[in-house]
Amino acid sequence: MIESCFNVGIWATGLALLMNQGQSPLLSNVGLSVLAYKATAMFIPRVGPSFIKRGFSGKDMNKVEKYVIPETMGAVSALVYFMCMIIFIPVLFYKYLVPNHNPNLPSDGSVAEVAKSQFPHDLLGAYLSALLSILSVSLLGILDDLFDIRWRHKFFLPAIAAIPLLVVYYVDYGVTYVSVPSIVRPFLKRSLINLGFLYYFYMAAVAIFCPNSINIIAGVNGVEAGQSLVLALVIACNDLFYVLSPKNKDALRAHLLSLYLVLPLIGVTAGLLKYNWWPSRVFVGDTFCYFAGMVMAVVGILGHFSKTLMLFFIPQIFNFALSVPQLFGLVECPRHRLPKLNVKTGLLENSYTEFSLNEHPLPKKTLLTISIFEKLRLIRVEYDPSTGRPLRCTNFTIINFVLYHLGPMREDHLTICIMGLQLLTGIFGLIIRHFVAPLVYPEDNI
C-alpha cells in the first residue's frame, strides 16, 4: 500500500512539473524526466518475456546458475527517451505556438504575426538534428544486437549519423576557433586559432568515440548503465554552472538545450539500472551503449563543451588507450574480455589472454607490448619458471586493471568502483573547467 502511494506520488509529481503554471520548459523537462524514469521501470519487466520469445536473450556468464534473461533492454530506454523528447517539442515552443500566453508579445491583433517572426527556427533545427543523430545511432545499436556487426564495420558509422547535427552546427553556429592559453599568446601573437574544417573532423571523432567508449567498458552487471548515469549527472552539473549563473545569452541557451537532452537520459538510465543492477534481471545490449554515448556526444557538440566533455570521459579514454594493443592486434584478443567468476569465493577475478605453447617464439611486437605494459603496472604477466616465456597476461581493460590493483571483488562492488572512478574524474573535470581554466583562458568561449 505504501509503495503504491509512493509510486502514484512520483507519477503525480512528474505530471505537475510537466504542466507547471509558469510554462518553464526546464521544469517541464524535469517532470518529463521523472515520468521517463517511471515509464522505463514500468515497461522493462512487462516486455522482457516478449524479448526472450523473439530471441533477444542471453545468459549471465558470471553467475553459478546461468538463467536466461532478456537482452537489448536498452531499446526500451531509447524508445521511452524518444517519446519524451517528441512530447517535449510543443512544451519547449509553447509561448510561440500559443502566443496569447506570452507576456513579452503585444496584446493587439498582431500577436500571432510577431510570434511567428520570433519563432526560434535555429533552436528547432538543432533540437531535431540532435534527435535524428541519436535515433540513427540507436538503430545501429539494434542492428548490432541483431547481427553482431564486426568492429571494423561499425566503428565509423556514428560519424555518418552525426552529419545532420554537423550541418546544423555549420549553418547556425559555425564556431570553429579555439582559445589560446594566455601564457602562450605572446609567442603566437593571437588569442584565437581557427581550425576550420578540422574542427568538424574533431566533432565527428567525438561522435565516434563516445558511443564506442561506453560499449567497450562492459561485461559486468550495471557497468554500462552505471557509467552512463554518472556521466549524464556530471554533464547536467556542468550545465547548471551556466544556467544558474548565466554569463551571456549564448551560453545560457546552449546549456539549456544540453539540459533538455540530458535530463531525460538520466531518467531512462536510472529506470534501466534498476533492473540491470547486480544480480541483473536484464541486459542492456549494444543499443543502450550507442544510444547513451551519442546523447552525450550531441550535448557536448550543441552545448559547445566538447573539449570539456573529454575531461569527463577520462576513464573511457584510459580504457581505450589500454585496449589498443588488443584492438589492433599487437596482443591476441579473445572474444570476451570480461572478468571471470571464482565459483568457490563468489568473487570476480582477472581474465587472461593465454599464449599458445606451440608458438615459438612469441612475436616481437607482443613481447615488447606486454613488457612495457607490465613495467607500467597496467597488466599482470605470468611466466614459465623454467624458460621465462610469457604464459598469459591479464586482458587490457580498465575492469581488469581495477581487479589487478584492488584484488578480486564481488560484481556489484566492482561496478561501484568503476562508477566511483567515473565520479571522481567528473568532479576533477568540473574543477578544471570552472576553477582552473579561467586562470589560463581570460575569456570564456562557452
Curated annotation (Swiss-Prot):
<feature type="transmembrane region" description="Helical">
    <location>
        <begin position="73"/>
        <end position="93"/>
    </location>
</feature>
<feature type="transmembrane region" description="Helical">
    <location>
        <begin position="282"/>
        <end position="302"/>
    </location>
</feature>
<dbReference type="GO" id="GO:0016757">
    <property type="term" value="F:glycosyltransferase activity"/>
</dbReference>
<feature type="transmembrane region" description="Helical">
    <location>
        <begin position="123"/>
        <end position="143"/>
    </location>
</feature>
<dbReference type="InterPro" id="IPR033895">
    <property type="entry name" value="GPT"/>
</dbReference>
<dbReference type="GO" id="GO:0046872">
    <property type="term" value="F:metal ion binding"/>
</dbReference>
<dbReference type="GO" id="GO:0005783">
    <property type="term" value="C:endoplasmic reticulum"/>
</dbReference>
<keyword id="KW-0808">Transferase</keyword>
<dbReference type="InterPro" id="IPR000715">
    <property type="entry name" value="Glycosyl_transferase_4"/>
</dbReference>
<protein>
    <recommendedName>
        <fullName>UDP-N-acetylglucosamine--dolichyl-phosphate N-acetylglucosaminephosphotransferase</fullName>
        <ecNumber>2.7.8.15</ecNumber>
    </recommendedName>
</protein>
<keyword id="KW-0479">Metal-binding</keyword>
<dbReference type="Pfam" id="PF00953">
    <property type="entry name" value="Glycos_transf_4"/>
</dbReference>
<feature type="transmembrane region" description="Helical">
    <location>
        <begin position="412"/>
        <end position="432"/>
    </location>
</feature>
<feature type="transmembrane region" description="Helical">
    <location>
        <begin position="191"/>
        <end position="211"/>
    </location>
</feature>
<dbReference type="GO" id="GO:0006488">
    <property type="term" value="P:dolichol-linked oligosaccharide biosynthetic process"/>
</dbReference>
<feature type="transmembrane region" description="Helical">
    <location>
        <begin position="254"/>
        <end position="274"/>
    </location>
</feature>
<keyword id="KW-0325">Glycoprotein</keyword>
<feature type="binding site">
    <location>
        <begin position="208"/>
        <end position="216"/>
    </location>
    <ligand>
        <name>dolichyl phosphate</name>
    </ligand>
</feature>
<feature type="transmembrane region" description="Helical">
    <location>
        <begin position="155"/>
        <end position="175"/>
    </location>
</feature>
<dbReference type="GO" id="GO:0003975">
    <property type="term" value="F:UDP-N-acetylglucosamine-dolichyl-phosphate N-acetylglucosaminephosphotransferase activity"/>
</dbReference>
<feature type="binding site">
    <location>
        <begin position="59"/>
        <end position="61"/>
    </location>
    <ligand>
        <name>UDP-N-acetyl-alpha-D-glucosamine</name>
    </ligand>
</feature>
<dbReference type="GO" id="GO:0016020">
    <property type="term" value="C:membrane"/>
</dbReference>
<keyword id="KW-0256">Endoplasmic reticulum</keyword>
<feature type="binding site">
    <location>
        <position position="215"/>
    </location>
    <ligand>
        <name>Mg(2+)</name>
    </ligand>
</feature>
<feature type="transmembrane region" description="Helical">
    <location>
        <begin position="216"/>
        <end position="236"/>
    </location>
</feature>
<feature type="binding site">
    <location>
        <begin position="335"/>
        <end position="337"/>
    </location>
    <ligand>
        <name>UDP-N-acetyl-alpha-D-glucosamine</name>
    </ligand>
</feature>
<dbReference type="GO" id="GO:0043541">
    <property type="term" value="C:UDP-N-acetylglucosamine transferase complex"/>
</dbReference>
<keyword id="KW-0460">Magnesium</keyword>
<feature type="glycosylation site" description="N-linked (GlcNAc...) asparagine">
    <location>
        <position position="395"/>
    </location>
</feature>
<keyword id="KW-0812">Transmembrane</keyword>
<keyword id="KW-0472">Membrane</keyword>
<keyword id="KW-0328">Glycosyltransferase</keyword>
<feature type="transmembrane region" description="Helical">
    <location>
        <begin position="25"/>
        <end position="45"/>
    </location>
</feature>
<comment type="similarity">
    <text>Belongs to the glycosyltransferase 4 family.</text>
</comment>
<feature type="binding site">
    <location>
        <position position="71"/>
    </location>
    <ligand>
        <name>UDP-N-acetyl-alpha-D-glucosamine</name>
    </ligand>
</feature>
<comment type="function">
    <text>UDP-N-acetylglucosamine--dolichyl-phosphate N-acetylglucosaminephosphotransferase that operates in the biosynthetic pathway of dolichol-linked oligosaccharides, the glycan precursors employed in protein asparagine (N)-glycosylation. The assembly of dolichol-linked oligosaccharides begins on the cytosolic side of the endoplasmic reticulum membrane and finishes in its lumen. The sequential addition of sugars to dolichol pyrophosphate produces dolichol-linked oligosaccharides containing fourteen sugars, including two GlcNAcs, nine mannoses and three glucoses.</text>
</comment>
<comment type="pathway">
    <text>Protein modification; protein glycosylation.</text>
</comment>
<feature type="binding site">
    <location>
        <position position="154"/>
    </location>
    <ligand>
        <name>dolichyl phosphate</name>
    </ligand>
</feature>
<feature type="transmembrane region" description="Helical">
    <location>
        <begin position="1"/>
        <end position="21"/>
    </location>
</feature>
<keyword id="KW-1133">Transmembrane helix</keyword>
<feature type="transmembrane region" description="Helical">
    <location>
        <begin position="311"/>
        <end position="331"/>
    </location>
</feature>
<feature type="binding site">
    <location>
        <position position="286"/>
    </location>
    <ligand>
        <name>Mg(2+)</name>
    </ligand>
</feature>
